[in-house]
Every structure is written in C-alpha cells, then in structure tokens.
Amino acid sequence: MTKYEIPIESKKKKSARIPIDKLHDFDGHPFKVTDNEDMDKLVESIKLQGIINPLIVRQKDNTTDEYEVISGHRRLHASKRAGLTEVPALIYPYTKTEAAIAVVDSNLHRERILPSEKAFAYKMKMEALKEQGKRTDLTLSQVATKSDTATAIGKETNESRDQVFRYIRLTNLIPELLQLVDEERIALTPAVELSYLTEQEQYDLMSTIESEDCTPSLSQAQRLKKLSQAGTLNADKIFAVMSEEKGNQKERISFPYEDIRRFFPKSYTQKDVYNAILKLIGDDHMRRERARKNRDER
C-alpha cells in the first residue's frame, strides 16, 4: 500500500439495507455498466442467492437518506433487473475526495477494463490526490506534483508514469474517437497523438473515418497533430492524409460489423470476434485440406 491510498478497512462503517431508489452512481465515475452475458449471469445469481457482498456507499453531501455508490455499480444494476427493492450496504464516512480515490481503487481490479475507463479513472484519481495533497487532515503532507501522483498510480496498476499520462490524454478525445479506441480500431499511441487535435478537427477526422472506412496509423496521426499545431489543419487536409495508402496496406474485404456481431456472445469484444472468425476460417481450411488429401489417396 502506498502513502496515497485510503484503505477501506481503516474507515469506521455501519451496515444497512438501503432502498434502491436512494442509491445513486458516484458523480463522474468512469466505469461502464453494460448488459451483456456476464451481467445476465449476475442477475440470475442475485435472483437465486441475493447479494452476497454488500455494496460500499457514502452518504451524499447535504442529505440524510441519499447515498452514492463507491463499489458495486454492477451489483446495483443487476439488482434493479432482478426486481429487488433494497440491497445490503456498508456505509463509510468518506469525504468526496476520499470517495473518488476509493471508487477508482475498488474498480481497477476488474479482469477487463476499457481504455476509456482507465483514462477517466486515472484522471479522477490524479485530481483527487492533488486535492488530497492540499488537506492537512488526510494522508498527504504536501501538495503532490502530477509526476508524483502519476508515479503512485503507476505503481498500483503496474504501469509506468508515462503510460498513466498517455491514458489521461485520451480524456481529450471526443466520445466517437474514444469509442474506436475501446473497440481496438485505433491503438493507444495514435490515439494519444489525436488527442492534441481541436474538438472540431476531431469531428472532421471522424467524418473521414466514417466515409472512407479507415482509421489513422501512428504516422498519419503524427502528421495530423503537426498540422494542427501549425494551425493549418482543415477537413480537406485531413481527408488528404487519411486517403494516402499506408505502407503496409493491402487489398482487403470489408463488411458491416453488425452483420456478424449478432452471431457471437454479447460479452465478446471486437478482438474476440476477430479471433473467433480467424479460428473458424482456419478450421474450415484444415477440413478442406484433409478432404483433398483423402481424394488424392484414393
């Protein structure tokens, strides 16, 4: 544990059963709750066994019976779907700043975290640690620099300080581009370069991506950033850069993603779908090869 962390166990708590309509998402929490196969399983589990692990919550500021969820957003959503009217919870006396840190720390252990979730989680924690550093009643004795906090976050998540900063840069992307990063259509490094484009430039880029069915390589992203910083980037230049054939670009077949997505589990990412398709093609190729050899041996 680092000097920046606030262990949940160190806080006095009380248990309670809280009506679901009195529970609210923590303001700005970065973790997405989606209805997929895993969520369906959680709903069925709650219907059969109830909630095994209580939610962790804090009382909302200036209220007496309203609460913010620190840990358990998925359980809360599943409970609503399961028809529950109240859930077990542990109420901790967190300040807003402590709560922000706890929200991030309690969710970063998940098996799969999207780049957008990491981006806003790291940003939330960095801002909270910065605020915490200004308080003498919390764990930091002096204001921490961005470098200090990024290093601390990196140690907790097994990432370098620079990688933490890269993820935080993604929060400057428009939602449409950030979605492409989550879908693994744009890699992290090119996405960081694109984050330096203005909002309008990003929307112009998105228009070209949609019309030309292409995404920028690192080289293209770097050129777009350079043109933007020079103040000369416009829709025409974006189109010109994106229309250039990439060095390793080869002829390809494309089709709407939605046409095949329905054949795979909801929990599959785009990469999972891609790998499954390759396996199916590979299995079919091996089957045809075996059939050919059998014919040749006759």
Spans of model-derived segments:
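Short, charged/polar connector segments at secondary-structure boundaries
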Residues: 1-92, 98-112, 288
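Amphipathic, charge-rich alpha-helical segments that serve as recognition/docking helices
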Residues: 77-172, 196
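Amphipathic alpha-helical extensions and coiled-coil-like segments
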Residues: 161-276
